[in-house]
Each structure stands twice: as C-alpha cells, then as structure tokens.
Amino acid sequence: LSIRYIILGGSFAIFLDSDHLLQFLDIELVSRMSHSIPFAVIVSIVFFVILRGKDIRICAVAFGAVLSHIAFDIFLADVALNSGTEFPLFSPFTFETVSLQGLDWLGIQIIGVSIVAIVSYFYKRKEIKLKNNLTKT
C-alpha cells in the first residue's frame, strides 16, 4: 500500500472518535455508534460509490480502520485501565453492547489487517493481469 492509504486509514481511525465532540455538546446519541460492523460496511460502500469502484483498496482500508480503532480501544482499556470495554458492535440493528477485553483486540486487529492484505493482493493481481493483457495485444 502507498503512504496515501496509510495516512487515510490512520486519519479515518482517529476521526471515528468525533462522536465524543457531540457528547460534550450534550447532544443525545448512542455512544460509540461508529464503533460497529454495520458502520464499517456503510463507510466502505460510501467510499466505493464515491470512487465509482475504481480502487477497492480504499474500501478495505476504511473497513480495516474501523476494526483497528476498535482493537486499539480494547487494548487501551486493557493496558491503561486494566479492564474491558463495551461496544454496540451491531448498531443500528441492536444497541446491546458487546463486552471485549484482554487479547480480544489482537483478533480484531488481525482480521482488519487480513482484510486489507487480501483485498490488496487481489487488486494487484488483477492490475498485473490487465497490464499483461494490454502488452500482449
């Protein structure tokens, strides 16, 4: 991945906590709603539509950034507070929170990195195949 994707993923992962700004303004909302799997899927679809499907890696990076952010929050709660944390992982379908703690962050991080790696591999493979087809004709 290029540095552009790394910066985008990191920025997006930080941007996920912008819901805390709304809480400071006493706006009623479901806390950590952006820390959910449906949100990650929606963000990926939005990027796909905006980019007109030209680069699917951005979609994977966005999805991976949400998972990475969730993993970091779990890691931080475990290391700094010696406790777990809860997320509404399936909001807006259900607002029940899922408790995560300990090494749960590692599994989530591995899933996020794996998604980006697999999508990048297939994207590059397709790109090379197209390039080879163009040079043959």
Region annotations inferred by a language model:
Residues 1-137:
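N-terminal membrane-targeting hydrophobic helices
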